[in-house]
Design a protein with these regions (language model features):
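N-terminal beta1-alpha1 cap of cysteine-dependent amidohydrolase-like domains
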Residues: 1-137, 145-153, 157-186, 203, ...
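Active-site-proximal beta-strand elements of phosphoester/diester hydrolases
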Residues: 232-236
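Catalytic cores of DNA base-excision repair glycosylases
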Residues: 190-193
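Residue(s) in the substrate-gating loop at a strand-loop-helix junction
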Residues: 198
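The feature captures the ABC ATPase H-loop/switch
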Residues: 141
Length: 277
């Protein structure tokens, strides 16, 4: 890379929709000192040549066939009533959320996108082999886990009992970050509150992966690789929380090598880690 040039960060997304997520992610990468390039099934990259980091963005559910399951038809749990204070905040932020939905063009669905699954699995594999940093966001976190041989919970109904399920773009969900994790090193010691837009989550961890954060109900909110440098997946959407310094730190860790967690260079890479007994 030319001295002084911004690191190139590949950002994956769908062919249709996802405009708001792309715009916010692009802004987050720019604020962190990088330059984002969009990658979609219709605008793919054969490999990670010339790219210095990878963000696997949110979107459609991962095809359950990739982790050995059939598609389950899960009934969504009814959203709980919002307190009046949250209703007022939501009203104030309505113009922003309306704009984001318009930019996204296509409503979020529980469908799959086989072309995107295939593209992103290939890019993750190449990035792992090259020891490039990877940040998975929501679906991206889940796909990273699947890449390493893990499985997903296709629905969360019934898992939010003591603390009802929260679905909001605002940072209302409190999570507990594992002490000594790479994520804790990046986010710092302060309490962490995140947004919640997901309906699936990590079930069985992939090989080499560990839990980096959970919510109060025990649902996995972040994962990371135990030995490979800066492979982190988060269940929330940090690109929509750029007003929060902790969330901007995730993108800085991706862009700036000195901000990352490092491991010895002798560790195995790529599918060696997935196929190892």
């Amino acid at each position: 890379m030319t001295p002084g040039a911004r690191p190139i960060i590949g950002v994956t997304g769908p062919d249709r929709g996802g405009g708001a997520a792309w715009w916010f992610t692009r802004t987050a990468v720019w604020l962190a000192g990088g330059h984002a390039v969009r990658i979609t099934p219709r605008r793919p990259r054969a490999n990670m040549d010339g790219v210095h980091g990878l963000i696997i963005g949110g979107g459609a559910d991962v095809d359950p066939k990739l982790y050995g399951q059939e598609l389950l038809h899960v009934t969504e749990k009814k959203k709980r009533d919002e307190p009046i204070s949250m209703w007022i905040i939501g009203l104030i932020l309505f113009p922003l959320t309306w704009l984001m939905r318009k930019l996204s063009a296509v409503p979020v669905t529980s469908g799959q996108n086989a072309a995107r699954d295939e593209l992103e699995m290939r890019l993750i594999d190449d990035a792992v082999r090259r020891r490039l940093p990877i940040l998975g966001i929501c679906r991206g976190e889940q796909l990273i886990n699947v890449y390493f041989g893990g499985t997903l919970l296709q629905g969360l109904t019934g898992l939010y009992i003591e603390d009802p399920e929260i679905r909001t773009i605002l940072p209302r969900k409190r999570i507990v970050v594992e002490s000594g994790s790479c994520l804790a090193n990046v986010l710092g010691p302060r309490p962490v509150r995140v947004n919640a837009l997901h309906r699936q989550a990590i079930d069985r961890l992939g090989r080499g992966m560990r839990v980096a954060a959970r919510d109060r109900n025990g649902i996995v909110q972040a994962i990371e690789h135990e030995s490979l440098p800066m492979i982190v997946g988060v269940q929330w959407h940090p690109e929509y929380l750029l007003q929060v310094p902790q969330q901007r730190a995730l993108f800085r860790a991706l862009v700036k090598p000195q901000r990352r967690c490092h491991v010895p260079a002798s560790e195995p890479t790529g599918r060696e880690l997935v196929s190892a007994a």
